[in-house]
């Protein structure tokens, strides 16, 4: 790939045989990733990214999971996984894994490494907080506004009261502070309309959307604003953590596995990647870009934040997830309300599938991975032999791509093994979450499938507990109970949404050759 100043970076594709997919888990069939997230799919917008030169002083650092070979001239990583070959000049720029932009060449290399997902930004400058307006959409939550506003005392704030029965009075909540403007809707129009009203009323370069049930932690704004020193970034989101992490058992589960908490790892936000979207409970956007993209879709009652992220991405903008910045959320911890909310989230998959074709498959893997997983799951001699044969063929096929590197067979074998584990994880998750009604019917009909389903439900739950365990969190037994209830609720909503829409695209797996 030619960049100003010479051919410094070449991105080696792994051929059309390999899926460009990703989500929360290890790669499957070497270059797929297992998914437990309903909004995961392929990455359709990479080629649309706008050219935007990084400023001098901007830094990047290689992601810790990226593997380097040939003295740093070959990088394997990113999401989806890819191989990048660096010219000696480019490799020298990132000798210790860090690159600072100082000229056009280093800016081009840094941009490509960022967009490939093998590096993360290290901004050197931060826009002023005076350039930010905070928009708080609220309905019938005076207490939440009273709790939130004191944290924002030095910022310009717009409170959008979306038809509350008793009008919200922010001045009562926080007297004597900075500029607070109230925009009232006479009747409730929904959170998207409330956010859009605040967006149109703001006059600053950046708008921070904060729901009335959140509390930002110290330093949240500065950590997020730094990413906007990259002119190609349109949205930044913090990590959503629990406001009360140690209450009831359900509160502790939410602290470990909230659908709003996207984890500890910083990432670009891309459809089909480990962080496919960010929740709108707390985000900062460029105001002009959000207006250009028509803000949030007011016709959507659910998943409007996912749709907004993907439309920004389709317009060529970059989005970042910054987990060092924390915003605490008052999670629902009454079981009936929590269960209903999880089911409500599931109904959002159908409208997303209609708007963003191919972006919400419950499973995404190659046929060879699916075949190997199903064959191995039979636990028969012929099945295990067939699975081994499929894996050996994958190693052979991948090895040819790594000719010229040291130990190409070892590299191919590691990636294949990771892919196989990822495929199993993806299949087990889908059985318990997206396809649990089908699994239930199969369990009734077959004793062998019954044993397999129970083993998958227990094993997947325990592994998920281990990956998300927190100090003071739930033990494995109660965690698995809540995880399975979580999956049943979401899956029920998924099927109901598809049935109501008479559109089954959200239930279709993507199986490639």
Swiss-Prot record:
A Pfam family found in this protein is Glycos_transf_2
MF (Gene Ontology): transferase activity
**Source domain of life:** Bacteria
| The name this protein goes by in its record | Uncharacterized 55.3 kDa protein in thcA 5'region
Q: Which organism is it from?
A: Rhodococcus erythropolis (Arthrobacter picolinophilus)
């Amino acid at each position: 790939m030619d960049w100003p100043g010479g051919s410094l970076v070449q991105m080696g594709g792994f051929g059309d045989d390999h899926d460009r997919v990703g989500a929360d888990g290890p790669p499957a069939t070497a270059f797929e990733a297992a998914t437990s997230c309903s909004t995961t799919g392929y990455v359709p917008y990479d080629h649309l990214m706008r050219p935007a030169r990084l400023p001098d002083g901007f830094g990047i650092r290689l992601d810790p999971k990226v593997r380097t070979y040939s003295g740093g001239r070959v990088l394997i990583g990113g999401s989806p996984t890819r191989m990048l070959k660096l010219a000696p000049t480019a490799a020298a720029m990132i000798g210790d894994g860090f690159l600072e932009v100082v000229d056009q060449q280093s800016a081009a290399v840094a941009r490509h490494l960022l967009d490939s997902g093998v590096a993360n930004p290290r901004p050197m400058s931060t826009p002023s907080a005076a350039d930010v307006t905070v928009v708080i959409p609220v309905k019938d939550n005076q207490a939440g506004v009273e709790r939130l506003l004191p944290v924002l005392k030095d910022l310009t704030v717009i409170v959008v009261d979306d038809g509350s029965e008793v009008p919200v009075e922010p001045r009562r909540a926080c007297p004597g502070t900075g500029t607070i403007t109230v925009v009232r809707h006479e009747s409730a129009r929904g959170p998207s309309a409330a956010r859009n009203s605040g967006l149109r009323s703001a006059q600053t370069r950046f708008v921070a959307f904060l729901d009335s049930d959140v509390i930002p932690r110290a330093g949240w704004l500065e950590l997020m604003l730094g990413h906007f020193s990259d002119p190609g970034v349109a949205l930044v989101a913090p990590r959503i953590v629990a406001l009360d992490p140690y209450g009831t058992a359900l509160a502790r589960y939410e602290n470990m596995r909230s659908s709003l908490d996207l984890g500890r790892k910083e990432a670009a936000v891309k459809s089909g990647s480990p962080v496919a979207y960010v929740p709108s409970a707390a985000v900062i956007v460029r105001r002009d870009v959000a207006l250009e993209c028509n803000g949030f879709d007011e016709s959507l009652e659910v998943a409007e934040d996912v749709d907004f992220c993907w439309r920004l991405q389709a317009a060529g903008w970059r989005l970042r997830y910054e987990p060092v910045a924390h915003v605490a959320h008052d999670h629902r911890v009454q079981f009936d309300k929590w269960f209903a909310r999880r089911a409500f989230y599931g109904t959002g998959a159908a409208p997303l599938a209609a708007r963003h074709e191919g972006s919400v498959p419950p499973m995404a893997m190659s046929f060879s991975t699916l075949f190997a997983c199903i064959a191995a799951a039979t636990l028969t001699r012929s099945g295990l032999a067939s699975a081994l044969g499929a894996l050996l063929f994958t190693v052979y096929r991948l090895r040819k791509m790594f000719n010229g590197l040291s130990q190409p067979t070892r590299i191919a074998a590691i990636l294949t093994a990771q892919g196989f584990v990822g495929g199993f994880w993806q299949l087990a998750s889908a059985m318990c979450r997206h396809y649990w009604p089908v699994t239930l019917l199969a369990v009734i009909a077959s004793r062998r499938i019954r044993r397999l389903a129970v083993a998958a439900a227990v094993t997947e739950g325990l592994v998920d507990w281990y990956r998300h365990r927190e100090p003071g969190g739930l033990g494995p037994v109660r965690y698995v109970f809540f995880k399975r209830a979580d999956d049943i609720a979401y899956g029920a909503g998924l099927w109901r949404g598809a049935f109501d829409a008479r559109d089954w695209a959200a239930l279709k797996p993507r199986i490639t050759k």
